Amino acid sequence: MKLTYIILFLFINIFCSKIFSQTIAIVNVQSLIDNNKIYQKTVKDIEINQDKYLKDFNITENELTIKLNEIEESKLILSKEEINKQIEDYNNQLSQFSITIEEFNFHYQNEIIKIREVILNEILKLLEKYALENSVDLILDSTTYLIASNSLDITTDINSELEKLNLNLEYKDFEKN
C-alpha cells in the first residue's frame, strides 16, 4: 500500500510540474492586422481605387435602367419580335454587367485576403521569435480561450515589433474583361 502511495505521489509530482512549468502567452491576431497602419492605408488606397470603377458601374446601371424603361414604353408601339429582341439584348447586357460586378467584388476580396495573409505571416514570424527569446511554450490567439490574465497578453509587444517592419502590401488593380 505504501508503495502505491509513493508511486502515485511521484507520478503526480513529475507530471504536474511539467504541466505547470509551461509558459503561455495570448495574442489578438485580428487586432494586430486590423489596427496595422500600413494595412489601414492600403485598404484606403483600395477604396479610392474602387471609386473610379464604382462611378462607371453607376453609369452603366443607369443606362440599363433607362433601356428597361424604353422597352416598357415601346411595348405598345413595337412588334412582339422587336420587343423580344430588345429584351434579349437588355438581358445580355444586364447579365454581363452582373458578371462584371461579381468579378470586381471577388477580385478585391481576394486582394484583401492576400494582404491579410502577408501580415499574418509576418506576425507568425514575430511570434516565433518572441517564443524563442522569452521561452514561451504556447501562444494562443485571443479567440481560442475564455478567460486569461492580462499579464499573458503579448499583443502590444508584437504590435510594436510589427509597426517597426516596413511591410510591402501590394494589390492588383481590377481589370475588366
Predicted segments with their positions:
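Sec-dependent N-terminal signal peptides
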Residues: 5-14
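Sec/Tat signal peptide C-region and signal peptidase I cleavage site
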Residues: 15-21
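Short, flexible, glycine/charge-rich loop motifs used to bind or transfer phosphoryl groups or to couple energy/partner
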Residues: 14-15, 129
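Amphipathic, charged alpha-helical segments and their helix-to-coil junctions
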Residues: 22-177
